[in-house]
Amino acid sequence: MRAPLGLLLFALAAHTSTAAAQTWSPEQQELWRVEDQQWKMAAAKDLTWIETMVHPNVSFWNANQPAPQNKASLSRWEKYDTANRTVLEQELFPISVTITGNVAVVQYRYQVAAENYKKERETVTGRYTDVFIKEGGRWLFITWAGGDDPKK
């Protein structure tokens, strides 16, 4: 969001592809669980994921933002977006989980149905590449890039 990140990383009760998960190592599965949990927390408007799952030195760039952002910016915009948007349904589609030492890259697509404060509904799709660093035995988001696909 992973998600909110952008319009979406506030989302997601993710569903994973069983076939993909069956071919992953235990460490890859662990990373996907972290990703899945972040989307679920964001969808539930539980912003504690920012303090518990994001590295203090995070720098990320969502497709809908004018420049890279830091953790303070993430908190500010997630609070705003969470107050103005509700996720109705979401699904994640894992593509890859690559691990090298204490760094991991997770790539996936998503689909989110949401409702804004005006009660207008919209379904969007998009993609993210998230990078994690393992510190103290935990995987933390250190950067990500992506967001909604362009409107057709």
Predicted regions and their residues:
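Amphipathic alpha-helical repeat scaffolds
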Residues: 36-40
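Positively charged n-region of N-terminal signal peptides that target proteins for export
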Residues: 1-4
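Boundary at the C-terminal end of the N-terminal hydrophobic targeting segment
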Residues: 16-21
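A solvent-exposed, acidic/Ser-Thr-rich amphipathic alpha-helical stretch
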Residues: 25-30, 41, 46-100, 107-109, ...
